[in-house]
């Protein structure tokens, strides 16, 4: 467990294409939580390393991660006659989990209905109860069998330029403004593995994963 000055640059995070903007975690299981319901979401959004304790999270506006960020940032007064939001909190807890049971990866990319948590679906796929545990520095539950867990928070409203990234279309995606994860802890198994995939024009590893 690294809580004092954690450093994600110690991890074997690859840079796969010459013009990529940096090193990217390409199989990240990003955990966020709805502040209203407490339900967790597991999504796969590429993560660019900015430094020892800063990571960009490439979640688009239609993804659950972005929806949870909006919910943390604002709350609507049910008695109000307008929909003007009121600022709730400046930070949102986030965890990036790497490795663990393969059903977690499938659950993170599956188009599940909003009322079905990825953790529950992963347990269904594995035909067993998925073991989860509390994160050590953030108010989140994370898979107990993950090889590596990067914990931190997003300062709501803070963005930095992420990219470019060699994508599955065969071109580099453009740079864009995305949230920054500030790392508060890194936990890992003693025999941790660091799974990764190379993204590019099919046929590539990520294409076979998508077909599966």
Regions found by a protein language model. Name each.
Residues 1-78, 84-180, 184-212:
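Extended, highly charged
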